[in-house]
């Protein structure tokens, strides 16, 4: 009981943090218990105040001594200690916080539409992005900020090739085609950073409209590459569409009498991408295009092992 009376108050600690008296703050923390350290003062915890002031050593002392509820506290401004640390580029603090954040807090969206992931991408915190992505929900990964950015767009903007590769398979159709408030797409930004592997991956995933948007704002060399890639994919789509029409629509399902050809078609299908083929069939106004796609998917599922070995 006397120990509680003698220990410093949370308010004293926050005052030391506010004036950036790091040495004094550390002395106070050493004398305080979890209940006092976890209190809220003017809507913030001592941890959030310390993150805001960039006092990393103070944060390191606070994190293991605070309650789970206090660590996951959301301020009236819509920040958590993690989103704030990411926005300030405090990599070490983010690294300490991530394992302690609840699923709700790790996916938290701030008032300006950011997540810890979008901030980490913007601040070039590649390691933090890698830690966050497996822990986040699909919705949070695909979050669009108030500026029209996604984590993928920001990663491309910053030239984070590894993060782009991780994110691309996880993006929803709308998010991968997202255009920012400044008129950029992940593809235009990847092109600007000369991330050839990334914009090649994106071309196979993005809609024709989004690609055309990129063509109006990209460098000459990038335009040439994209146009060649689209042309190549269209040739593949055309050949595959013709073969599938003959196979699935010629005489019904029984017309599939050449298994090797179908395996080859599956290989083309994997290269061309389901979405691109669908768009091609619709553009060409092919009858029963939905049926063709469904039958191709069924064939791949049925013979996935053989396709994997041959393709």
From Swiss-Prot:
The answer, when asked if rRNA-binding is one of the entry's keywords, is: no
Gene3D superfamilies found in the cross-reference section: Ankyrin repeat-containing domain (1.25.40.20)
Q: Which UniProt keywords apply?
A: ANK repeat, Repeat
Q: Which InterPro entries match?
A: Ankyrin_rpt (IPR002110), Ankyrin_rpt-contain_sf (IPR036770)
Q: Which GO terms describe its cellular component?
A: cytoplasm
Pfam families under this entry? Ank_2
Name the chain's protein.
Answer: Putative ankyrin repeat protein RF_0923
Species of provenance = Rickettsia felis (strain ATCC VR-1525 / URRWXCal2) (Rickettsia azadi)
């Amino acid at each position: 009981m006397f120990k509680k009376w003698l220990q410093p108050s949370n308010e004293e600690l926050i005052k030391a943090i506010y004036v950036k008296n790091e040495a004094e703050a550390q002395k106070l923390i050493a004398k305080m218990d979890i209940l006092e350290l976890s209190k809220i003062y003017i809507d913030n915890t001592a941890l959030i105040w310390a993150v805001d002031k960039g006092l990393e050593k103070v944060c390191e002392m606070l994190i293991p001594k605070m309650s789970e509820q206090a660590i996951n506290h959301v301020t009236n401004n819509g920040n958590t200690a993690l989103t704030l640390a990411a926005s300030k580029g405090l990599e070490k603090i983010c690294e300490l916080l991530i394992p302690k954040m609840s699923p709700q807090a790790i996916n938290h969206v701030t008032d300006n539409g950011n997540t810890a992931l979008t901030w980490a991408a913007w601040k070039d915190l590649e390691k933090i992005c890698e830690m966050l992505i497996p822990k986040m929900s699909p919705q949070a990964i695909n979050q669009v900020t108030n500026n029209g950015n996604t984590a993928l767009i920001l990663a491309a903007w910053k030239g984070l090739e590894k993060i782009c590769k991780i994110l691309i398979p996880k993006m929803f159709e709308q998010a991968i085609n997202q255009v920012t408030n400044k008129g950029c797409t992940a593809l235009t930004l990847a092109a600007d950073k000369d991330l050839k592997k990334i914009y090649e991956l994106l071309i196979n995933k993005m809609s024709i409209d989004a690609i055309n948007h990129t063509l109006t704002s990209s460098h000459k060399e990038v335009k040439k590459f994209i146009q060649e890639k689209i042309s190549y994919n269209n040739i593949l789509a055309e050949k595959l569409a013709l073969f599938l029409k003959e196979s699935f629509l010629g005489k019904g399902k029984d017309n599939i009498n050449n298994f090797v050809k179908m395996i080859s078609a599956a290989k083309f299908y994997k290269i061309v991408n389901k979405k691109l083929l669908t768009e091609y069939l619709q553009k060409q106004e092919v009858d029963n295009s939905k049926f063709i796609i469904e039958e191709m998917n069924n064939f791949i599922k049925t013979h996935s092992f053989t396709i994997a070995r041959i393709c």
